[in-house]
């Protein structure tokens, strides 16, 4: 004797069963590091992280001198003060998928995919993308980019005045 089972779905239940898994979120960040006319220029250390009220800060990337012998570049990470206080002091560097080399002046595009590195999947709500730069023998600056995440994604932009130029972010699926 052979027993067989059939399940018949109709309407929205059928559409739900056929739906593909939700695509990963991608956060594209465009960051401008201004060219400076100073006698001794050092590339800035840059930290990018996400904050949401009531949730721990999530480091997306920390750009510093990763090639310095004996991880010597990590010594100066505490100069990226706001990031250091928010989440840096608890991070072991170099962190896989998070640490990267410093960048030269110019416009840079960085992309973060949910589930990789430090990028979480963002539920709808209000977030702040924090971008902080600090330079040896230079200044430091923090730029806050507000992101109102909806099911459709989010967009935000802000601009620095000295160590950072324009910063924009686009969250999409």
Which ranges hold each PLM region?
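Sec/Tat signal peptide C-region and signal peptidase I cleavage site
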Residues: 18-24
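Beta-strand signatures of extracellular beta-sandwich domains
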Residues: 47-49, 61, 130
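Short coil-to-beta strand junction motifs in C2/discoidin
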Residues: 40-47, 124-126
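Structured domain cores in non-transmembrane regions
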Residues: 53-122
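Glycine-rich, aromatic-bearing surface loops/beta-hairpins
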Residues: 105-110, 118-173
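Short amphipathic, basic-aromatic surface patches that mediate peripheral association
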Residues: 29-41, 64-67
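Bacterial N-terminal signal peptides that target proteins for export
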Residues: 1-11
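Secreted peptidase-domain scaffold signal
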Residues: 28-29, 168
